[in-house]
Amino acid sequence: MQVILLDKIGNLGGLGDQVNVKAGYARNFLIPQGKVVMATKANVEMFETRRAELEANVAKQLAAAEARAESVNALEVTIASKSGDEGKLFGSIGNRDIADAATAAGVAIAKSEVRLPEGALRTTGSFEVSIQLHSEVFATLKLEVVAAE
């Protein structure tokens, strides 16, 4: 199914690209979220008239994400959790815990923006957590996990 991208989408392309995707992916995910429109003649003309507006929206979102990235990079968060003698935690620190701690420290982060490629944190210590604020913008959060008293 031919569609026109209204936003940058990973592994597909950028704003204005005409790409071929599976019909189910377009109908069930991309079109309901407003990320694409069908590539009909009328939609192509409509897109060309709205191109400047859409590009301005994308640039505005990117600038907002870069501003948030600067505040996240400057942030240092400490999480206290119960742990054993050797520094192993009773439980783990996951995406939600990190997002809640960062939000409590003053920078709003959604749990879906936190990237833990090696899974949840299970030991005490210092960690650098990757935060994906936009498809092109990543920030690094300094996280200290300490033993609770």
UniProtKB/Swiss-Prot annotation:
Belongs to the bacterial ribosomal protein bL9 family. The keyword RNA-binding applies. GO terms for molecular function: rRNA binding; structural constituent of ribosome. It comes from Aliivibrio salmonicida (strain LFI1238). GO terms for biological process: translation. This is Large ribosomal subunit protein bL9. GO terms for cellular component: ribonucleoprotein complex; ribosome. Keywords: Ribonucleoprotein, Ribosomal protein, RNA-binding, rRNA-binding. The keyword rRNA-binding applies. The gene is rplI. Binds to the 23S rRNA. InterPro entries: Ribosomal_bL9, Ribosomal_bL9/RNase_H1_N, Ribosomal_bL9_bac/chp, Ribosomal_bL9_C, Ribosomal_bL9_C_sf, Ribosomal_bL9_N, Ribosomal_bL9_N_sf.
